[in-house]
């Protein structure tokens, strides 16, 4: 969604300030290429991070246990957890 809104914004700016249709096409093409390259770099960084995490079997076990916990199941217990934590304090 971010890419689409960025492209539309650039298209509007290009239409306002461009001298010709070719300038508009070139500007949009450059922005799309830059956005694609940025996304690929982010994905590459994420893949590198995931490769490091996968090598540790204990990390996977904790991550798997954390995924099983659903936020909706935990939310009703949050006030009780806070009260239990604060009971020993003055």
UniProtKB/Swiss-Prot annotation:
Threonine amide sites (modified residues): 87
Signal sequence extent: 1-18
The keyword Calcium is annotated on this UniProt entry: no
Propeptide residues, chain positions: 19-59
One cellular component (GO) term of this entry: extracellular region
Keyword line: Amidation, Antibiotic, Antimicrobial, Immunity, Innate immunity, Membrane, Secreted, Signal, Target cell membrane, Target membrane
Tissue-specific expression: Expressed in entodermal epithelium along the body column.
Location relative to the cell: Secreted; Target cell membrane
Major subcellular site: secreted
Family membership: Belongs to the arminin family.
Biological role: Antimicrobial peptide with a broad-spectrum antimicrobial activity. Keeps its antibacterial activity under a wide range of salt concentrations that mimic physiological conditions of human blood, which is surprising, since Hydra is an obligate freshwater animal with nearly no salt tolerance. Does not affect red blood cells.
Protein name: Arminin 7722
Organism: Hydra vulgaris
């Amino acid at each position: 969604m971010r890419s689409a809104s960025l492209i539309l914004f650039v298209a509007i700016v290009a239409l306002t300030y461009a001298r010709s249709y070719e300038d508009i096409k070139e500007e949009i093409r450059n922005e799309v290429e830059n956005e694609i390259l940025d996304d690929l770099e982010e994905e590459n960084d994420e893949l590198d991070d995931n490769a490091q995490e996968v090598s540790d079997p204990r990390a996977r076990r904790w991550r798997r246990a954390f995924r099983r916990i659903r936020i909706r199941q935990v939310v009703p217990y949050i006030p009780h957890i806070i009260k239990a934590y604060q009971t020993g304090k003055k």
